A protein has these predicted regions:
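Conserved CoA-thioester-binding segment of acyl-CoA-metabolizing enzymes
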Residues: 5-87, 108
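Short, histidine-centered active-site or binding-site loop motifs used for metal coordination
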Residues: 46-50, 102, 165
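Hydrophobic alpha-helical scaffolding
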Residues: 55-58, 103, 107-110, 166-170
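Residues that form or flank phosphate/diphosphate-binding pockets in enzymes
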Residues: 56, 90, 142
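Glycine- (often His-adjacent) and acidic-residue-rich active-site loop
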Residues: 84-116
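Conserved catalytic cores of soluble enzyme domains
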Residues: 110-112, 118, 122-176
Length: 176
């Protein structure tokens, strides 16, 4: 006779998958979503539909982060948790986006994307509300920058993080 498996929720852990429904989802885009997880706290979840295994940073993710920070600054919310329960946190920028901009000669698009990312990280860094990031597994390049600028980080014991742009032949911009 099969018996049901009884699952005990750790009282100190938050299962973010429980908040992924239409009632709690405030905005959803290609690579990220904003959820209201109660008690005046927002959650930004990364979930790239293009490369879900690594959640590469793209315009959609930046737009969601900007919108979440806008909501936070209204005063209706008192904190933001950036975390999800996928395979990897964020393995950095989608280098193919940069390659396409360079190949097409449209460097303004690339410059605008870099500037937008810098503006988002500065808003996270200087937010008067707490922004808690929860990186795990891969947090490379822009993924590292997202959590390095937050007011609080709750990192997984299994975290591989850093600025790996030099491996790609690029020089990271640390002029923050």
């Amino acid at each position: 006779e099969k018996k049901p498996l009884i699952y005990k929720q750790n009282k100190k852990a938050l299962n973010l998958n429980l908040y992924k429904n239409t009632k709690n989802t405030l905005k959803r885009d290609w690579s990220a979503s904003i959820h209201d997880i109660g008690d005046g706290v927002l959650n930004v979840e990364f979930h790239s539909i293009f490369v879900p295994a690594v959640n590469p940073l793209d315009r959609s993710m930046n737009d969601i982060m900007k919108h979440a920070l806008d909501l936070l600054e209204t005063g209706k919310y008192k904190g933001l948790v950036v975390g999800h329960q996928g395979k990897n946190w964020c393995a950095g920028a989608n280098v193919n986006d940069f390659k396409m901009a360079i190949d097409s000669g449209n460097l303004q698009v690339m410059d605008a994307g870099v500037k937008e990312m810098q503006e988002v990280t500065q808003r996270i860094r200087h937010s008067k509300y707490p922004v808690v990031t929860c990186p795990f597994n891969l947090a490379l390049g822009g993924g590292f920058e997202f959590y390095a600028c937050s007011s609080h980080t709750v990192a997984s014991g299994e975290l591989y993080a850093g600025l790996v742009e030099a491996i790609q032949g690029l020089i990271p911009d640390d002029q923050q």
